[in-house]
C-alpha cells in the first residue's frame, strides 16, 4: 500500500434532489476536481489528501432533471459516509415545494452539522439549510427573487440579499 492510499480522503457530500439547478451540482464538482489535480501535482505525496465526492439523496432512485439528465445518487442519507463538507445545490425556481418534500434531507443536514460537517448552501439551496435551523442567527444569502419569501419563512436568519 502506498502512502497515497493510506491518507484519509476529504469526504464531500453533495445533496441531490428533484428540481436542483444542475450547474450548482456540476460546477462545484469540476472546481473541486481541478483543485485536487493542482494539489496533487504541487504537494509532496504525503501532504496530498484526495477527495471522495458522493451524491447523497433520500433514496437511490434516479432523479430526473429539467435538463433531461438524470442524476444517479451514490448513496442514501442513511448510508452516507460522515462528511467533512456538504454542498447543497440551488433549487430551480420556487424552492418552497422542494423544501416541503425533503424533510429527510433537512434532518440529515442537522445531524451532519451536529457531527462536525461544514455546510455550503448555494443560492436557494440555503432554504434547505435554513429549514434545518442551521442559519438561525447567522448571515446568509439566497437568490434575489426569493429574498422576501426567505425573510418570511426564516425570520431568525440575517438575510444579506
Residue ranges and their predicted role:
Residues 135-161:
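A conserved active-site-flanking secondary-structure segment within enzyme catalytic domains
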Residues 1-119, 128-131:
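Extended, subdomain-level signal for the structured scaffold at the beginning of enzyme domains
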Amino acid at each position: 500500500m502506498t502512502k497515497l492510499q493510506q491518507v484519509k480522503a476529504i469526504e464531500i457530500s453533495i445533496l441531490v434532489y428533484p428540481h436542483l439547478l444542475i450547474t450548482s451540482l456540476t460546477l462545484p464538482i469540476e472546481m473541486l476536481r481541478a483543485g485536487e489535480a493542482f494539489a496533487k501535482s504541487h504537494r509532496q505525496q504525503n501532504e496530498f489528501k484526495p477527495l471522495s465526492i458522493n451524491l447523497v439523496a433520500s433514496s437511490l432512485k434516479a432523479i430526473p432533471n429539467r435538463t433531461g439528465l438524470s442524476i444517479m445518487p451514490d448513496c442514501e442519507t442513511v448510508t452516507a459516509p460522515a462528511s467533512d463538507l456538504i454542498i447543497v445545490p440551488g433549487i430551480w425556481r420556487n424552492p418552497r415545494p422542494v423544501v416541503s418534500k425533503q424533510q429527510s434531507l433537512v434532518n440529515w443536514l442537522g445531524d451532519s452539522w451536529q457531527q462536525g460537517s461544514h455546510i455550503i448552501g448555494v443560492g436557494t439551496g440555503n432554504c434547505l439549510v435554513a429549514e434545518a435551523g442551521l442559519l438561525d442567527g447567522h448571515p446568509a444569502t439566497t437568490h434575489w427573487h426569493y429574498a422576501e419569501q426567505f425573510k418570511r419563512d426564516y425570520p431568525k436568519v440575517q438575510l444579506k440579499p
